[in-house]
Structures are given as structure tokens and as C-alpha cells.
Amino acid sequence: MIIRSPEPEVKIVVDRDPIKTSFEEWARPGHFSRTIAKGPDTTTWIWNLHADAHDFDSHTSDLEEISRKVFSAHFGQLSIIFLWLSGMYFHGARFSNYEAWLSDPTHIGPSAQVVWPIVGQEILNGDVGGGFRGIQITSGFFQIWRASGITSELQLYCTAIGALVFAALMLFAGWFHYHKAAPKLAWFQDVESMLNHHLAGLLGLGSLSWAGHQVHVSLPINQFLDAGVDPKEIPLPHEFILNRDLLAQLYPSFAEGATPFFTLNWSKYAEFLSFRGGLNPVTGGLWLTDIAHHHLAIAILFLIAGHMYRTNWGIGHGLKDILEAHKGPFTGQGHKGLYEILTTSWHAQLSLNLAMLGSSTIVVAHHMYSMPPYPYLAIDYGTQLSLFTHHMWIGGFLIVGAAAHAAIFMVRDYDPTTRYNDLLDRVLRHRDAIISHLNWACIFLGFHSFGLYIHNDTMSALGRPQDMFSDTAIQLQPIFAQWVQNTHALAPGATAPGATTSTSLTWGGSDLVAVGGKVALLPIPLGTADFLVHHIHAFTIHVTVLILLKGVLFARSSRLIPDKANLGFRFPCDGPGRGGTCQVSAWDHVFLGLFWMYNAISVVIFHFSWKMQSDVWGSISDQGVVTHITGGNFAQSSITINGWLRDFLWAQASQVIQSYGSSLSAYGLFFLGAHFVWAFSLMFLFSGRGYWQELIESIVWAHNKLKVAPATQPRALSIVQGRAVGVTHYLLGGIATTWAFFLARIIAVG
């Protein structure tokens, strides 16, 4: 009889003490690469050090080791996020007028930074109301704090300290899970377990605990605040949690406890889990009871989703089975093989996640103004504009990142020998049809959308307004968009009988919410001007997609360079002696895609900024007459290129240009400085490497003459490095210019 040892119940998924902690190694620059660790011969060394420090693929080809490094780096990232959050809360506690703002949010602006007087910069401390002098902030933190029920600066202090503790914990975890207990590759590849934990844990329990916090703490505190009770008189959060009678005074059904839940008499909870739609007329934000209901519903969905995948118990879905079953009559092998790709190539996985996160970030941008979630957010125009702009830029960058990592996957991780007739292979085989059609769409959109504007500029110059495309002459109404708006406006009582108001006031109708004499939100009319600019959006988005998709689909090979995969992700040209092959690497497509992403997002935020100032934001008189900031000039002015230049860029830049000597003068300086940074980029983008190498050599000659030549030989930037420096300064300069322009304008007039 053979006696077998019993099977271990739990699989050991970590290695103990795999890598010793060595400060000596960390202190040696480039310890991850034999070449770089030798130290610098030329100045190119410092660029290679930066380029490769986080390119874990180049340090080792062992997927387990790469996975551990990425995992550990994520903890470092979380630590930095907690540190940043702690800093934000600390500023709120130590340097802000939060308590004053809380007592009168319609007349007092949010500020959490007071400039010290050293050489006269105290001019930046403007009067934000209530006798407080500081820099007006537009981050939306005050509104979030009020929505979460924070009523004092002491609470902000405590939260800041808590975030610091978490930052330290994350740093420790990053070290621990690389040096002490590092997960095995199998753990990183166990996607079912990962899905269950992330869905049920992070999203499910995360939403549930937030819903719980909202019901037990935020709602009662905000009830009191909305009624005008002094924050100091309001019971503290723990009193609401521990004393049910306090809550029952505000929401009588609380007295019944969990009985309605177990007797399925759920409508009893409708007081604090509501389904109202629209905005709270006191704060101009969504009803917090709607938000609590939403998070509870989301929590239940994700808790169910987190129990769908098969792990130790042999029941539930397997991702591999789902993907392999996913094929249609025209898609060959369908998603067969995708499971292997996504569990062995983190670039492929990251690409997918970046594309989805980037898209949802842009969705967030569009919801923050149309369904403003926090109290008094809607009347803080600077914050509204900042949040929209911020989320648009972030979304754009994430989507370009998706294309970048898709291309890296194609070059480094794609194995054409094992992939046949699955969806990816089929897309690659008809890439010429895809790219040429997309190119045609771009040309069509570009000529037609720009052509409409040029027509209008010409007719305007010839004094023929009756021949222009406009709401008062030849109309091009966005009838489909208007139909969508109307459908949503009519939804309460039709398709959504339970709702009292439509999801957003922007859809239409006659409702207007004003808070403290300022418009929070009203129906947004769409007309010919919007039709024109939306086609510019379509054009710029399609060109961005064309560039990025071409980079991905031709990353491994093309007719011009059949062996492109051997040259890697980034290379300047296909070697000397082969002209006309520069700027074809996958990296160069990302480089070019960034410029078009910048174009696309710029037009979007310009459209938003002007449209809101013209048709939404403004003041309302006692008689109910609305006066918009720019008096509704969008519909007639934005239909010509000249109108955009004259009535938007030039007219609205007057605040930033004339900001000197006022508390907004920092924006004037940033406006100037960021223009300079942007112009500086052109020096890198429009200049050849040889020019600089010649210049450097004559400078080195002079140093040798004076016997002050350094041991490290100076070198001109490589072609790729020069373009990287160029695009970085182009984007940072452009974004900072826009930021200064927007904020100086909206803080002055909003």
C-alpha cells in the first residue's frame, strides 16, 4: 500500500525572502542594467537612465519578476496618492476658510492657500469674501467635503493624518511584497479570483460602505446644513451612528430599523434612498438621497458580480471558456487565444484598461456639469470649468497611452506563429482596408467641417449674412441631438414613470435652478453653431484614432519595412542608406498622436467654456431675468473662424492679459511663461540633430582651450529624445497656457 501525503488545501502562492533589501544597490545609478551601471561616457547616459528605469521588460525577460516589480510599483503609486490627498486635507485644515465657506457658500469663495509676503507676492491673496484673503481654489474639495458631512477643520486634520498613515502602510506593502513575500506568477494570472475580489471587494464593499456613510453621516448633516443650522450646533458623525433616535427625528422610518428590509417593505426607506432626479434647489447639486440610493444599487450589482467567477469551488464562469465561446459566423476563431494574451502580456492588459479608463474619465467630465454631484458645485464656475478641462485632458492622455501599450504589446509580446484566424489576426490581415477607409473618413470630415466655417467666414467678409450657415439664415440644426435631448426631457412620466424630474436639466423643459442669484443649471439649447463644432470634434477624434491605430496595426511590419518588429518599439529610421524610412516606429505614432489628441481636447474645452458662458452661466434678477456672462453670443459668433479668434480667444483673454497688479497676476505670468515653454518645444521639433552636434563640438573645443572640459563627453540629443522633449514641452506649455487663460477669465467674471 502506498501512503500519499495529503494534498495541501491551500496553494502556496508566495515566495519568501526572494530578493534581499540592499541600499547599496539602490544607491548605484542604473543598477538594473549592465550597460547603464558602468556609468557615463557621454551625456546620453542620463537620458538612457531615465528612459529605462521603469521599463521593466528591459531589465529581465522573466514574467514573474516583471509582474512583481509592477505590483510593488503600484503600492508606491498608492502611497504617493495618499500623501497627495493628505496634503489636500491638511491644507483644508490649516490654511483654508472652509468653516467660513460652509456657513455662506454663495458669497464666500473657497481658498486653501495663503501666500507669504516675501517680495510682495501677497498681492496674490485676493478677497474671497468673509474677510478672508487667499488664492481662490478650483479643485472642488470644499464641495466634496460638505457632501461627505465634514463640518470642521479638526475633522480635516484627522483625515489628513489618517491618509499619512495609509501612505506609510502602502510604502511598507510595496517593500514587503517584493522583498519579503513576493507573489508567484500563478497568483498574478488567476484572473477569476482577481475579478471576484476587485468586483466584490473594491467596487462592491467600497460602494456599500460609501452608501452607509452617506445614509448615516452625510445625509443628516447635510439636512441640517441645508436648513441653515450653524455647523457647530450639528451633532458629530459618531452621534448619528451610535444614536438611532437622532436619525429617526430626521427620517422617521429609521425607527423601524431593519424590519422593512426583511419584510420586503422597502418603500419605507424612500425617505433617504430616493429616486427624484433633478437638482436640490437649495444647493444646486444632485439630491444626496438619490446619490446614496445609487451607491447602494451599484454595491448590490458588484457584490453579485463578484460571485460570478469560478475559483476553488468549481462553480461559476471561467474567463477562458467565455472568451473561447465568443465567436460569430463571420469572425473565424473569435476570441480564442485572447485569454493567453491577456494573462502573459501586461502591455495588452494595460492597453485595454487605459482605453476603458480614459473613456470613462471623459464620461465623468461630461457628467460633472450636467449632473453636478456635490452641493454648491454648480454655481462655482471656476471649479466647473477646471473639473471639465482636467477630466478631458486626463482622458485624452489615457487613451493615447492605450495605443502606446497596444503597440508595445504588438512589438514585444505578440507571437504571430501561434495566432491564426482569431479576431486580432483577422484585423491585422485587413488593416489596409481599415486604415485607408479611416483615412478617407478623416479627409471627408476635415474638408467638410472646416469648409463650412470657411464658407461662413467668406460670406461674413462679403457682407452676405443671409448666405451663411446659422440659426438665422441657412439652418443646419443638429436634429438627432435635439431628438435625444427631447426624449430624455420627456422621460419622467413616459419611459421613467417613477422619476419626478429628468436625469439632467440640460435635456430641456422649462426648469431652471438658481442658487444665490447665480444660475446652477438650465436647459442647454443646441443649434447650427454646435452642429459645426461637433463636426470639428468628429474630425479631430478620427485623425487621432487614425494615427494611433496605424501605429498599432503596422507596429510589427509594413510594406515599407517588412521586418519592423526587429527594430523595436522606438527607432529613428531603418538604418543608414535607406532614405524615407524615418518616423515610422510605433513610438513615433504615439508622438504624432499626442499632437492630435491635444488638438481634439483643445477644441472640446474651448467649445465647453464658451458655450457655458454664453448659454448657461450667469446671474438671475429678482424678476427671474437671466443675464449670461457673454450674453448668448455663441450661436452667432462661433460659426466663423474669425468669431472664435475675436470673440472667444481675444475677447476672453483680456482678463489674463490685464491681470498684472491684481490678485490674478500669477495667471498673467503663467500665461506668459507657458507660452514660452510651448515656443521652446519648437526648437526641439524643428531642428536637426547634426546642427546641435556641430554646435556642441565647437563649445567643447572652447572648453578644451581653457582646460575645463568635462570627463563625460557632451552629445546632442538623439532624434527620439529630441522629439520626446519637444512633445513634452509642447503639451505642458499648451495646457498651462490654457489653464491660465481659463482661470483668470472665469475667476474674474464668474
Swiss-Prot record:
EC number(s) on file: 1.97.1.12
Family matches, as PANTHER family: OUTER MEMBRANE PROTEIN, OMPA-RELATED, PHOTOSYSTEM I P700 CHLOROPHYLL A APOPROTEIN A1-RELATED
Cofactor, how bound (note): P700 is a chlorophyll a/chlorophyll a' dimer, A0 is one or more chlorophyll a, A1 is one or both phylloquinones and FX is a shared 4Fe-4S iron-sulfur center.
Family label: Belongs to the PsaA/PsaB family.
UniProt record, GO biological process: photosynthesis
Domain of life: Eukaryota
Protein name per UniProt: Photosystem I P700 chlorophyll a apoprotein A1
Positions bound to [4Fe-4S] cluster: C573, C582
Entry binding sites for chlorophyll a: M683, Y691
InterPro entries linked to this entry: PSI_PsaA, PSI_PsaA/B, PSI_PsaA/B_CS, PSI_PsaA/B_sf
